[in-house]
Amino acid sequence: MSINEEEYLRLEEEIDLGDIDFTDLEEQYEADLGYDNYVIVDGAPIAPEAKVPILIKVLRKLFSTAGEIVEGDEGIFMPMENGKSKGFLFIQYKNVADADTAIKKLNGKKLDAQHRLLVNRLSDIEKYGSVSGEFKEPEIEPFQSHGFLQSWLQDEQGKDQIVLHFNESVGVYWNKKTSEPEPVIEPRRGFTSKYAKFSPKGTYLFSIHPQGIQAWGGADFHRIKRFFHNQVRLVDFSPNEKYMVTLSPLPITLPDSTAERAQFPFGPESEGHKLVIWDMETGEPARTFALPPHLENQKEMQWPLVKWSFDDKYCARQGPDALAIYETPSFQLLEKKLVKIDGIQEFEWAPAGVKLHNSKEANEHLLSYWTPESANQTARVAIMQIPSRQVLRTVNLFQVSDCKMHWQSEGKLLCVKVDRHTKSGKTLFSNLDFFKVTERDIPVEKLELKDVIVNFSWEPKSERFVTISRLDDGNPNPAIPKNSITFYAVEEGKGKNANSKYKAYKQIENKHSNTVFWSPKGRYVAVATISRSSGEIEFYDVSFDDETSKKAAPANVKLLKTDKYSGMTNIAWDPSGRFLAAWSSSWLHTIENGYRIYEFTGNLLRDDSVDQFKEFIWRPRPESLLTSSDRKKVRSNLREYSAQFEEFDAMEADAAVREAILARRKALEDWRAYRAKHAGKKVQTSKVQAEVIEEIKEEIVEEKEEIVE
């Protein structure tokens, strides 16, 4: 029904529009009032009216750095009250993009020592000023179970899982020794744009993408969490998987859209930063950092940039002449200040808690660092206790070219490999300084050598170690085998107060070997030559037991096996120390790509050539939950367990043997079931009387043959 103009005017006079609630329509149809190019600035100085033009001129100059401001009084309006400014002002930019730039660039800007400017979009002030005062129950997402994330540890045969990265696909498999690896999940094409990586305890598998990092886990490796970090390149983890560290070459940039900012994981305080520490439980960033200026222009990035204490309680970053140590989970600076160390070159955390001499604390947090020589000071190596920052031990060094710090896995010993030069500077040689951390006053044993050590490696949970060294004779020809492999162990001193010292128990000269890989369980070590032209692996037993070995000797080295592997690029032990994998990666060359799996004794189990093979990854295992008594029980029943695993191996190797073993097990189960069924029944005796049966056998005692003619 239509109405004329007179009726409309009459209704308009009768109806008060102020009594009508238009809230539902306003929420449904949001009007663009054109305020997005206005910003409101709070925190400005309160100035008398006479000085307001000067203040406006200063602020116009500052805010013009973000974009073009509308000319005249329309561009900047500063409210007045009682002859003074109110401390805030309105600025109109010519476009929305300039207003966004002003918010990003100038929000939090210090105008002077007493005034910090707070810049917000005018439309946001109106939006957040109209928030309802009524409490609204937050919506909690329903709990989503990811299953048992360590289910692979329940495998009856104790098999390990491996990741094979080839072509553009990534697959997870069970290692089955000589047999074809059994897929846990089918290979996924495009699983990662760069590489895949497990967390330190094997709980999560991570894939790298242009948008960020994806965490996978569970029995079927389903998606668990996403971590948005644009163009991320590097990733690292804290030892107990509580935190993840990512690095991107691109700085964090806040989205322009308000809706996108609401979903963005980073706030304004993270803008321009490149390094992010993530909380693995929540999936949220715990702290972000800008790269120090001295790292921004480096072609090769030192990684990791953040190093962790053994229990994730502390982390630290190295900067110019200082060490920044943070407490978790707040990630605030320890005691709110840096640790000043002039010229610090490198630092390392002890990999385990340390029991210092005469200390009640069983798990002290220690870190070591070194500083180079300067005009007024010698080079130094020091051990510091955290959180007290107390320097427990310092050693001065002379004519130092470089230092490398190697902590023993239990944190009881620190070896510092010191590369020194002669006074002429033409010849290099190495010294080894051993800090005995758990003893009184932390004594230091020095081992002086004539060679340059190119590789050093501790045996896990032991005082033995292996070095690869060469004589610096000025002839760098790589075709000449000049490296020496040396096996060291502690020789106990004779007498009551005699000190122990390190002794070389075996040396093998004229080798090309350049890398050392200890089994995670110790005793067995692989010494390898890794190069693009040739490759070789030698397997050694450092506690070989035979009739000629001395029972009390701390080391008896025996070469078990040697295998040539041309084009080998990488080597890795499995977590149990039973197997070693070596592979040729297409990331470095395209010659005979593939992988090999060996037993710890060096026997070759599997040799697979795979086109465009990139990487072989063992899935890590968490530390064993067995107590010392549990381990003792396992050792006492080792023969029984060995028989079970040998049976498993026989079944895997031969289908006929498998069928025979399964049939034998079935027959045994049937027999036991039959016995259990009839065990309680009484035997019915027969009424037939017993009778003795006689049996007569004829036996020929002698036989004669007579011939009649």
UniProtKB/Swiss-Prot annotation:
Keywords: Cytoplasm, Initiation factor, Protein biosynthesis, RNA-binding. The keyword RNA-binding applies. Belongs to the eIF-3 subunit B family. It is found in: Cytoplasm. RNA-binding component of the eukaryotic translation initiation factor 3 (eIF-3) complex, which is involved in protein synthesis of a specialized repertoire of mRNAs and, together with other initiation factors, stimulates binding of mRNA and methionyl-tRNAi to the 40S ribosome. The eIF-3 complex specifically targets and initiates translation of a subset of mRNAs involved in cell proliferation. Residues 1-221 are annotated as: Sufficient for interaction with PIC8. Residues 1-98 are annotated as: Sufficient for interaction with HCR1 and TIF32. Pfam families: eIF2A, RRM_1. One of its GO terms (biological process) is formation of cytoplasmic translation initiation complex. Component of the eukaryotic translation initiation factor 3 (eIF-3) complex. One of its GO terms (cellular component) is eukaryotic 48S preinitiation complex. This is Eukaryotic translation initiation factor 3 subunit B. SUPFAM superfamilies: DPP6 N-terminal domain-like, RNA-binding domain, RBD. It comes from Lodderomyces elongisporus (strain ATCC 11503 / CBS 2605 / JCM 1781 / NBRC 1676 / NRRL YB-4239) (Yeast). Gene3D superfamilies: 3.30.70.330, YVTN repeat-like/Quinoprotein amine dehydrogenase. Its main location: cytoplasm. The keyword Secreted does not apply.
